[in-house]
């Protein structure tokens, strides 16, 4: 199943995900993940289906379903996610650069309705991405 197909299916089942997501289970340690960083507010872990030599996700522990639904009071937490992405990228040796992506909604190919940053690098990335 393609990532776009997964996103379309997730959008249909978004109300089901409202109670729990894959990322909620990772936060609660109910399913394994290769965790790189964790504190009280954020978690970073390797993507299970990497799209680049280095591909990790950064998520807030407090669930925001999608960027579109973020409110002013979420600003500090979203900023924290960006800073965490930068710190982890440095830790993983991505000094030559990397890309940060947020998929938002069905057309943005969001497949898990828990805000997350994709951080991709480890090679020369192309533009436009598609």
UniProtKB/Swiss-Prot annotation:
Pfam family, one: HIT
PROSITE patterns recorded: HIT_1 (PS00892), HIT_2 (PS51084)
GO terms under biological process: purine ribonucleotide catabolic process
Signal peptide stretch: none
Residue ranges occupied by any HIT domain in the UniProt entry: 22-130
InterPro entries assigned: Histidine_triad_CS, Histidine_triad_HIT, HIT-like, HIT-like_sf
Position of sequence motif Histidine triad motif: 114-118
GO-annotated molecular function: hydrolase activity
GO cellular component, one term: nucleus
PANTHER family: HISTIDINE TRIAD HIT PROTEIN
Protein name, per record: Histidine triad nucleotide-binding protein 1
Organism from which the protein derives: Caenorhabditis elegans
């Amino acid at each position: 199943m393609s990532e776009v197909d997964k996103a379309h299916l997730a959008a249909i089942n978004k109300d089901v995900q409202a109670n729990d997501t894959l990322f909620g289970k990772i936060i609660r340690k109910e399913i394994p993940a290769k965790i790189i960083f964790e504190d009280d507010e954020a978690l970073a872990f390797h993507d299970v289906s990497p799209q680049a030599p280095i591909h990790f996700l950064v998520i807030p522990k407090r669930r925001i379903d999608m960027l579109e639904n973020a409110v002013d009071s979420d600003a500090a937490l979203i900023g924290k996610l960006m800073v965490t992405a930068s710190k982890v990228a440095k830790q993983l040796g991505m000094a030559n650069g990397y890309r940060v992506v947020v998929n938002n909604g069905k057309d943005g190919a969001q497949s898990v309705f828990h805000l997350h940053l994709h951080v991709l690098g480890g090679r020369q990335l192309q533009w436009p991405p598609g």
